[in-house]
Amino acid sequence: DAPGGASDAQKQ
């Protein structure tokens, strides 16, 4: 995925 905290939040 693209770099970014928001993206990481969805993954978890």
UniProtKB/Swiss-Prot annotation:
One of its GO terms (molecular function) is oxygen carrier activity. Hemolymph. GO terms for cellular component: extracellular space. The keyword Secreted applies. Keywords: Copper, Oxygen transport, Secreted, Transport. It is found in: Secreted, Extracellular space. Hemocyanins are copper-containing oxygen carriers occurring freely dissolved in the hemolymph of many mollusks and arthropods. Belongs to the tyrosinase family. Hemocyanin subfamily. This is Hemocyanin subunit 2. It comes from Liocarcinus depurator (Harbour crab). The lineage of its organism: Eukaryota, Metazoa, Ecdysozoa, Arthropoda, Crustacea.
